[in-house]
Amino acid sequence: SIFSNKYVSSKLNSYKIYKMLRNKINLQNLFYIFIAIHLILWTLIPSLTNNNLPLDTIEHLAWGSNLDWGFNKHPPAVAFFLEVFYQIFGSQDWAYYLLCQIFVVIAFIVVFKFAEELFKNKTLSLISVLLLEGVYFYNFTTPEFNVNICQLPFWALCVYYSWRLFDKHQINFKDCFLLGLFAGIGFLSKYLFIYLLIA
């Protein structure tokens, strides 16, 4: 009787572990499906409905043809990333809408990973990203590649690596290096990025 209870208990624990792993895998897959749908829809819709690129994107493309360390309005990263895509894809409008969504999706991935480490719960991680989708700068304004879109992944990466440094209570060279790298690129994306660094 003692052995049968242990056997049943062990089988129940195995089933609970299996069910927990299956749910985690399903949530991970759901997250990947969500970001794929976001990437495809927000690339296709403006590609099919807009007659031309948004004005900020056109302005930054013009800056990209003559890259400097800064311009009268904004730092150079936005023009640099657009110029890279221009060298690869030429004047295909869909490519610039795709670039926007790549930056947004990277931010989603970082937020999902950060929430997963913070909450230790994939459901809350997925909810975090879904709530972020409701924020104005992550949906309707995303087809326009400008400094606001350009800074999104670097903002998320700086918060993530800052948290990792404070959470571990020890200095990790890799985390410090990545924090510095993403902070630098973030500042070169939008000058107001300095507020995050000061905070």
Model-assigned labels for residue ranges:
Residues 3-42, 126:
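Start-transfer (signal-anchor) and selected internal transmembrane alpha helices
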Residues 45-60, 69-84, 90-95, 148:
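Extracytoplasmic catalytic/substrate-binding loops of multi-pass membrane glycan-assembly enzymes
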Residues 66, 174-191:
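Membrane-interface alpha helices of multi-pass inner-membrane proteins
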Residues 101-105, 133, 149-162, 176-179, ...:
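Alpha-helical transmembrane segments of multi-pass membrane proteins
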Residues 119, 158-175:
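Membrane-interface transmembrane helices that cradle and orient dolichyl/undecaprenyl
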Residues 128-133, 183, 187:
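Short helix- or helix-capping micro-motifs
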Residues 140-151:
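Short acidic/glycine- and proline-prone juxtamembrane loop motifs at membrane-interface regions
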